[in-house]
């Protein structure tokens, strides 16, 4: 595992998280989501089912991303 997920975050099954990505407090990455390398998901971010996030993306606190 070459990425960081804070212990308060929840990662569903069938999720890809790229190398060097950081997922901070109280995030939820839902089934089928794909997050590229060297990304940062701020506190309380929700990545919905099947969403694709590219490389080097920063998503700030309290943001939800839907397909």
What are these regions (language model features)?
Residues 6-7, 12-13, 18-19, 24-25, ...:
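Left-handed beta-helix
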């Amino acid at each position: 595992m070459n990425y960081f997920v804070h212990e308060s975050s929840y990662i569903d099954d069938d999720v890809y998280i790229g190398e060097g990505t950081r997922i901070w407090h109280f995030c939820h990455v839902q089934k089928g989501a794909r997050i590229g390398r060297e990304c940062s998901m701020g506190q309380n971010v929700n990545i919905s089912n099947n969403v694709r996030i590219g490389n080097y993306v920063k998503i700030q606190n309290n943001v939800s991303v839907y397909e």
